[in-house]
Amino acid sequence: MLAFARVTLTPQLPARQRMEIITMIKGRIHSLESFGAVDGPGIRYLIFLKGCNMRCQYCHNVDTWNPDTDNLMTADELLDKAERFRSYWGKEGGITVSGGEALLQIDFLIDLFRKAHERGINTNLDTSGQPFTREEPFFSKFNELLKYTDLVMLDIKHIDDEEHKKLTGHTNKNILDCARYLSEQGIPMWIRHVLVPGITDNDEYLKKTREFIDTLDTVMNCLLYTSPSPRDS
């Protein structure tokens, strides 16, 4: 999922050269948008990454599923582009990274968000939480990422695990665990949920979704979206 410089890392390399290798991590980029008004607080510069494990039946970014792309960019290249539009952001705006599933490129995300904070740029992670696990090495990397994350927009596809599997092809257990962990760590969250006729708009499911959200301490907003019936598989 990542591109690295083709240099053999040996103890004999000067420290500066070793640092240059580390900072040459490149993200697989799907697309960029300069003016996002509904993707976090304020006006956001949007970075869509390639690759997603889930196969949501109502997905409107199907072309981001495949991780393959020739569009590779470093964190500094992206931030240089983003800062051209900084005058629009005001006090609340910044960058939002989405996908695809951004957490599949967590090493790149850490580099991007760390450098964004060094430039005083607000960071927002838009994720389904599907890659989340408390197992290593992901868990340590996730905690490192949170040091530079100002907001997480977490998309809960379905509160019922079996229905979630039908809808996305994956369990929701680690996604709900991700929400709990973010709350435990004091990370501000916006919860997103899509109302799909006949699938997620059931009163019982909505009640359970609300009950789960009520157990979280750091939810600032809940955003409901509507979608037509899912496409034929």
Specify the residue positions occupied by each region the protein language model found.
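Conserved AdoMet/S-adenosylmethionine-binding subsite of the radical SAM
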Residues: E83-F85, K91-G94, G99, L103-L223
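N-terminal [4Fe-4S]-dependent radical SAM core
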Residues: E20-F48, M54-N71, R84-K91
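Acidic, Ala/Val/Gly-enriched low-complexity intrinsically disordered segments
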Residues: A3-V7, A15, E20
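Short connector loops/turns at beta-strand edges and beta->alpha or beta->beta junctions
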Residues: C52-M54, K157-I159, S227
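Conserved small/polar residues in nucleotide/adenosyl-binding loops
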Residues: Y225-D232
